[in-house]
Amino acid sequence: VLYLSSNAAPLASGLKGGACMICDCHLHTAFSGDSNTPARVQIERAISMRMKEITITDHHDRDSSFCEDNFELDLPSYLSALNTLKEEYRDKIRINIGIELGLQLHICRYLEKFHKDFGSEFDFIIGSSHFIRSHDPFYPSFWEACGSRQGLEEFFTLSFKRARAFHPFFDSWGHLDYAARYAPDSASVYSYFAFKEQIDSILRVLAENGKALECNTGGFRSRLSHQNPDTEILKQYRRMGGEHITIGSDAHAPEHLGYGFTRAKELLKQCGFHYYTIYHNRKAEMIPL
């Protein structure tokens, strides 16, 4: 792990004067089925916000044909396009090549092959648990069939099994309580303590294997109005010895890039973190908050 001081030299030139913003390590472009934003637009927005670097992490969810959008990347085309942009903008901003990898137990052989063939091509891989029994909790139909409590229990149980099986294949666990964003009764049903056993099992896998936990500020824009995961989960990860936190807006549009980062920075300090982590070539670099 590389620690960078707060006085470390900028990671990209062309940024003069004024404070630089935290690197956004979770954002989407038109390569993701649920975004219409060209990668170039996100990059230009980041430059205007004085970010030294960003990590583009478009969706790659194998076996997601049941979704309305296409979440499976043409990996060679994706990598080629981002490498071209990385070179084009090298004097203005550092572009890290990432991916948000959808984890499902029944595609274990595919995930093994993906990591063998493409793992070294990325700077950063987010591991995400999105789907439950070929349903996306984003859609109300999932909750209508099972209810909020049962749906969340199943989500966290599956997430633990996925984290345990696939932790060698990712660097940071994305939006750990993702499903709680969309559960209709989240305000009354969901809390860390209500699902402590399942959530702690996930955090233990991450902490014991040196994996990062993502602070996803997209939750600030959800009905819950808090980051994902919940503050108590961030505190528990720290108590368990977890030290790597990645920060991402989950922006699918340029106006959401870096959303809530000042708020997240102060919150993470209150949770006991002094650094956040950026990945380059799959290696962690810790930056003072």
Regions found by a protein language model. Name each.
Residues 57, 128, 176, 216, ...:
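Conserved residues at the C-terminal ends of beta-strands
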Residues 15-113, 117, 182-193, 217, ...:
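An N-terminally biased module of ancient metal coordination in phosphate/nucleic-acid-related enzymes
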Residues 22-24, 53-55, 94-98, 123-126, ...:
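Structural preference for beta-strand elements that scaffold enzyme active sites
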Residues 68, 73-208:
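Extended substrate/RNA-proximal surfaces in nucleic-acid metabolism proteins
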Residues 2-9, 13-27, 39, 133, ...:
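Charged catalytic cores and adjacent phosphate/nucleic-acid-binding surfaces used
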